[in-house]
C-alpha cells in the first residue's frame, strides 16, 4: 500500500535526519500510475491521518492515467469489470487544483495512448486550475529505457527531475522538531 508506506516515511523520516515536509513521490510505469493516483486522490492519504499537502511533489513517469483504456483482459485481471472501480483507480478523474506540484514525464516511444493519457492529465489539471503541473516527452526513449536513463550523466529527464525538486523544495533551514 503506497499510502501506508508514505505515511510511515512521513512519521519516521525525522528519526533519520530527514524532513517530513520534503517528501516527493515518484514512480515509473505501474509506479507512475500509483504516484499519480496518490498525488491526486486524497482519500488514500487521509486514511493515514495526512492531507495531500504532505506530498511535496509527484513525478509520475510513463504512468497510466485512465485504467479503463487498458486492454479488457488485463484490466479485468487487475481491476475487475466495474466501471466505478476503473474510474476510482484512474488519476485523470481525481485531478484538482489542490494536488501537489506534478511533473509528468513520458517517453517519445511510449504507446500513443499512454502519451495521450499523460497529455490529457496535464490538460485536466490545468483546466482544474492547478498552478504547478508540467509535462515533458523525453525524446529517443522507450517505455522500458526511460527510467534507467534518468540517472545518466546529463540525461534530459534527470535534469528535469532535479530542477523540479529544486523548484518545489521547502526552505533549506533547520529540520522541524519531532512531533509527539
How would you name each of these model-derived features?
Residues 63, 106-108:
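Cell-envelope and extracellular/periplasmic
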Residues 105, 119, 126-180:
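C-terminal catalytic histidine-bearing segment of alpha/beta-hydrolase fold enzymes
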Residues 4-74, 86-87:
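Primarily recognizes the serine-hydrolase "nucleophile elbow" in alpha/beta-hydrolase
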Residues 29, 108-110:
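Residue-level signal for short, function-critical loop segments
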Residues 1-5, 121:
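A general structural detector for well-ordered alpha-helical segments in enzyme core domains, enriched
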Residues 79-94, 100:
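Active-site nucleophile elbow and catalytic-triad environment of alpha/beta-hydrolase enzymes
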Residues 98, 104-106:
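Short beta-strand/loop motif that positions the catalytic acidic residue
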Residues 111-120:
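Conserved alpha/beta-hydrolase "acid-adjacent" motif
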Amino acid at each position: 500500500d503506497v499510502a501506508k508506506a508514505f505515511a510511515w516515511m512521513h512519521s519516521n523520516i525525522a528519526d533519520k535526519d530527514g524532513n517530513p515536509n520534503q517528501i516527493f513521490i515518484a514512480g515509473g510505469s505501474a509506479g507512475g500510475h500509483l504516484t499519480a493516483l496518490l498525488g491526486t486522490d486524497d482519500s488514500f492519504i487521509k486514511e493515514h491521518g495526512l492531507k495531500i499537502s504532505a506530498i511535496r511533489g509527484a513525478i509520475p513517469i510513463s504512468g497510466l492515467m485512465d485504467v479503463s483504456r487498458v486492454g479488457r483482459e488485463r484490466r479485468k485481471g487487475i481491476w475487475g469489470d466495474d466501471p466505478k472501480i476503473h474510474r476510482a483507480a484512474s488519476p485523470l478523474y481525481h485531478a484538482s487544483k489542490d494536488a501537489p506540484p506534478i511533473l509528468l514525464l513520458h517517453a517519445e516511444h511510449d504507446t500513443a495512448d499512454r502519451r495521450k493519457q499523460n497529455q490529457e492529465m496535464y490538460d485536466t489539471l490545468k483546466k482544474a486550475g492547478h498552478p504547478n503541473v508540467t509535462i515533458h516527452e523525453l525524446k529517443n526513449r522507450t517505455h522500458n529505457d526511460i527510467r534507467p536513463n534518468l540517472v545518466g550523466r546529463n540525461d534530459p529527464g534527470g535534469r528535469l527531475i532535479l530542477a523540479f525538486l529544486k523548484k518545489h523544495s521547502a526552505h533549506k533551514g533547520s529540520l522541524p522538531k519531532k512531533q509527539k
